[in-house]
């Protein structure tokens, strides 16, 4: 018998389909809640809904995200606000509400989806990587605040994941997947859940991703700038 699921999304058709599939395949309760998590009121609404329904949330997974390839000066301010609220504000408030309930019960698990870009200077998504750096530091600090009360906090730092986020041809997807640049979402999810259940503080899945993070950390900024200006590398960065 697995965990019952509360799934939240702003895509109602896909949300209902996923919930129905979970009920059928795993014989669990799967509740679908339509919400725009970029709204600042969303976290409180979800917490209040769970309270009113009597749903005790043992595991909180903050995974909602959006990606927009655009330099900062070419990005509309409204889009910047949406990304910041979705990644930073809502995650923080969800952890505030549900984290307090977990603390009072003396048990719980939180998984926060950051990104390998939290460690990297990534041109064309400076706004995105900055929000992921916030989540990195937030998750690390929150672990210190909650682990003594029986609540674990795990931060996940995947690289590029093979999802519709990236507008790639089938040939390019296949090539990047074979090189380990693109990871299967199922593999990332499985490793993230495993790390969370073992109480790990952090996980960067994938050898390629770990190597990139280490290399970028030790290279001088001027050298890294020269490398990312090389045309094939620049074009690849703009696509993944």
Each language-model region and where it sits:
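Substrate-binding pocket helix/loop in short-chain dehydrogenase/reductase
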Residues: 71-72, 76-84
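The beta1-alpha1 cofactor-binding region of Rossmann-like NAD(H)/NADP(H)-dependent oxidoreductases
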Residues: 12-13, 34-45, 77
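Residue(s) in the substrate-gating loop at a strand-loop-helix junction
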Residues: 115
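Conserved glycine-rich Rossmann-like NAD(P)H-binding loop of the short-chain dehydrogenase/reductase
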Residues: 3-17
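SDR active-site lid
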Residues: 144-208, 236
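Active-site helix of classical SDR
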Residues: 95, 131
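Conserved NAD(P)H cofactor-binding loop of Rossmann-fold oxidoreductase domains
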Residues: 63-68
């Amino acid at each position: 018998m697995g965990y019952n699921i509360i799934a939240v999304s702003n895509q109602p058709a896909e949300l209902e389909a996923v919930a129905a599939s979970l009920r059928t395949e795993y014989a669990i309760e799967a509740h679908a809640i339509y919400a725009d998590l970029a709204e600042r009121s969303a976290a409180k609404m979800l917490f209040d809904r769970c309270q009113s329904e009597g749903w005790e949330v043992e595991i909180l997974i903050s995974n909602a995200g959006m990606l927009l390839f655009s330099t900062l000066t070419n990005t509309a301010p409204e889009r910047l606000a949406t990304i910041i609220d979705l990644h930073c504000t809502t995650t923080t408030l969800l952890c505030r509400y549900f984290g307090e309930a977990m603390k009072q019960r003396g048990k719980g698990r939180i998984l926060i989806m950051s990104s390998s870009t939290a460690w990297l200077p990534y041109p064309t998504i400076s706004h995105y990587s900055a929000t992921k750096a916030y989540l990195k530091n937030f998750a690390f600090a929150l672990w210190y605040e909650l682990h003594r009360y029986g609540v674990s906090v795990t931060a996940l730092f995947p690289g590029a994941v093979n999802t519709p986020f990236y507008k790639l041809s089938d040939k390019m997807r296949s090539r990047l997947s074979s090189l380990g640049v693109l990871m299967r979402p199922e593999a990332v999810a499985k490793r993230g859940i495993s790390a969370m259940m073992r109480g790990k503080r952090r996980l960067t899945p994938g050898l390629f991703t770990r190597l990139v993070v280490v290399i970028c950390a030790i290279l001088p900024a001027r050298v890294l700038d020269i490398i990312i200006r090389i045309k094939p590398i620049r074009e690849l960065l703009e696509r993944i």
